Regions:
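Short helix-coil boundary/hinge micro-motifs
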Residues: 1-107
Length: 108
């Protein structure tokens, strides 16, 4: 089965000719018939700006499973789960939030 290709230190992975932002399964919030995302750690790292811009403009992400560090934050990418279409991308303070709208490709 073909899977995305990422690089250590990059917040993106290549899939079907696109460089897509990778988001972490640990920040997913299931609801009644919905799946939302809330990453509470947006900060000053210069990687955030192009990462958020890519989610907003492409409206597509790769959901990943990660090893968590002692602080509960994603530390190392373990696998790719799926690509998703997303909408309602918002950044408020240190929170990045959006809604998953459609599962596009499966990798697990």
């Amino acid at each position: 089965m073909a899977k995305p290709v990422g690089r250590r230190g990059s917040w993106f992975a290549d899939w079907k000719g696109e460089s897509l932002p990778c988001v972490h399964e640990c920040w997913c919030r299931p609801g009644k018939g919905t799946l939302s995302y809330l990453d509470p750690h947006v900060g000053d790292d210069p990687k955030w700006s192009p990462f958020i811009a890519a989610i907003r403009s492409g409206e597509k992400v790769i959901l990943t499973r990660d090893e968590l560090g002692a602080d509960g934050q994603p530390f190392r990418r373990l696998s790719y789960i799926a690509t998703y279409g997303v909408k309602d991308v918002q950044v408020e303070g240190t929170n990045l939030a959006f809604q998953f709208v459609e599962r596009l490709d499966n990798f697990t």
